């Protein structure tokens, strides 16, 4: 998740990209997230007064429906959601228009700090004071082309950014992720009111809400509240885009994530995207099926639901699935049991000698098949310090590794060491490079 972000928003041809390039030194920008869309968000970073700042350039917003305007507006709204502060840039020589008023109203509804910047003022006397009719306390006057006045704008931006180096949390991070109305807030409240005492609140350390350090059965855990995207939108995709972006950021930031599914609905596109992202990127997750009290159940209903999830997401037997009712508090204790078990698994230390003996026994049970002109031989192994269990195997030649044998080795590790809820990463290194 990027921190200390400025989004540049405005109509076409008001100088957004000129300001963007002035800030980043005209370096080539990077297009993120949505290849094939005509005008994606452009990201870069720059330094001001010794502080590293991220900036997003966006496409020009218009009321008139032109080609790709819906996509441009979606991209702009996502940029606003990501930003700590928004620069609303206008043509300072031109009169205010209905497009400008519409954009400013949209920015006000976002709740983000807004800095109104009147551009194209190589000659300050040409400034149209009608821009104050927007209601902004101050309108900064600049020339992005020549760099005039930009320093004052950046000094104002710094007031809304957080450069506290102590933001790194020493606690285990748990996030609750789900689409709107899946029950995230209810689950957070169930954990809060019934199972923990608040140790401290950390406000302002995330754009996605408030983080609370809680104590669960003697374990201090930082819970990341990702709730909050519930507002209506004229563009159908906007809410899901924002929710997906927020959820993926939480997955990246967390040590463990609870992916909350609404059992009263079919598995949603949102759920599939989040679970798929977690599995592809080796993120520890617990799938939590909520509102289970509303389901007409038989003795086999729970197992049938588990099978449906397993069939949808192949090769993930390590992902635990729990069924709860956040509203009634049913099975919340069981969910906490799993959270603490996964935490224990992620933090487990293994002596190199124990791991090496396990791998040697595995090779005796099933030797590696010939592959690429040779047969793999593993001499010794060790576990490295990492957010997920990561094992380094020192071998005769890593080109002899067949994917099926790597899968076999992972299965042997899981059968002998408790790693429920944890992805496993195996790295092969040639023995001659063991000190790399």
UniProtKB/Swiss-Prot annotation:
GO MF annotation list: GTP binding; ribosome binding
Residues covered by the KH-like domain: 348-432
Keyword Repeat attached: yes
GO biological process: ribosome biogenesis
Keywords, ordered alphabetically: GTP-binding, Nucleotide-binding, Repeat, Ribosome biogenesis
SMART domains hit by this protein: RAS
Protein name per UniProt: GTPase Der
Biological source species: Mycoplasmopsis agalactiae (strain NCTC 10123 / CIP 59.7 / PG2)
Lineage, uppermost ranks: Bacteria, Bacillati, Mycoplasmatota, Mycoplasmoidales, Metamycoplasmataceae
